[in-house]
């Protein structure tokens, strides 16, 4: 009895948000932007022992192919315009991970030439603290970003994925 299903179990029903978010969170392509010692730990995370490929994460060298940027290390005021330009070249939706104490809060460098946290210039989605953080910490941060992406609401009216995240004041 009940409604007959002519196609049987060959159809999966899901919301469009859930489907798009699943695709995005299981295929993050981060732009590598290593500025100091944290970059070594980021490279170790991509190596065989930790293997980011199993999470669908493939490092990209071009911002036009990336949907995430990992700021790893000390951000100087001279480097900040370059980071902003790279961020602007990334297609939407895009996410930012601040890796290491220097990227999160300036670290031990409380000086005029160091930006005291990349969140002064870019909207940071995940902070990975440590000096430098271990590869396991970056993996945990990436998994937190995947959780965040999975819960996002998409606006499919004008363009896919232009969320309601607040941008920092210029």
Swiss-Prot record:
Class of enzymatic activity (EC top level): translocase
The organism's place on the tree of life at top rank: Bacteria
Protein residues bound to [4Fe-4S] cluster: 37-38, 102, 131
Keywords per UniProt: 4Fe-4S, Cell inner membrane, Cell membrane, Iron, Iron-sulfur, Membrane, Metal-binding, NAD, Quinone, Translocase, Transport, Ubiquinone
InterPro entries found in the cross-reference section: NADH_UbQ_OxRdtase-like_20kDa, NADH_UQ_OxRdtase_20Kd_su
Signal peptide: none
EC number: 7.1.1.-
Cofactor: [4Fe-4S] cluster
Subcellular location(s) of the protein: Cell inner membrane
Xref: HAMAP family: NDH1_NuoB
Subunit: NDH-1 is composed of 14 different subunits. Subunits NuoB, C, D, E, F, and G constitute the peripheral sector of the complex.
The protein's role, per its UniProt record: NDH-1 shuttles electrons from NADH, via FMN and iron-sulfur (Fe-S) centers, to quinones in the respiratory chain. The immediate electron acceptor for the enzyme in this species is believed to be ubiquinone. Couples the redox reaction to proton translocation (for every two electrons transferred, four hydrogen ions are translocated across the cytoplasmic membrane), and thus conserves the redox energy in a proton gradient.
Protein name stated in the entry: NADH-quinone oxidoreductase subunit B
Protein's organism: Geotalea daltonii (strain DSM 22248 / JCM 15807 / FRC-32) (Geobacter daltonii)
Lineage of the species this protein comes from: Bacteria, Pseudomonadati, Thermodesulfobacteriota, Desulfuromonadia, Geobacterales
Gene name as annotated: nuoB
């Amino acid at each position: 009895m009940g409604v007959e299903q002519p196609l049987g179990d060959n159809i999966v029903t899901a919301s469009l948000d859930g489907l798009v978010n699943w695709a995005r969170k299981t295929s993050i392509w981060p732009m590598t932007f290593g500025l100091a010692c944290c970059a070594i730990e980021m490279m170790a995370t991509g190596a065989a022992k930790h293997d980011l490929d199993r999470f669908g994460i493939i490092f990209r060298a071009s911002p036009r192919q990336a949907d995430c940027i990992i700021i790893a290390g000390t951000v100087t005021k001279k480097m900040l315009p370059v980071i902003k330009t790279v961020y602007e070249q990334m297609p939407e939706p895009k996410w930012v991970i601040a890796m290491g104490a220097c990227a999160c809060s300036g670290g031990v460098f409380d000086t005029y030439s160091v930006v005291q946290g990349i969140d002064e210039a870019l909207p940071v989605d995940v902070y990975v603290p440590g000096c430098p953080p271990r590869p396991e910490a970056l993996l945990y941060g990436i998994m937190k970003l995947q959780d965040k992406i999975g819960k996002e609401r998409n606006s499919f009216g004008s363009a896919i994925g232009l969320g309601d995240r607040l941008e920092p004041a210029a």
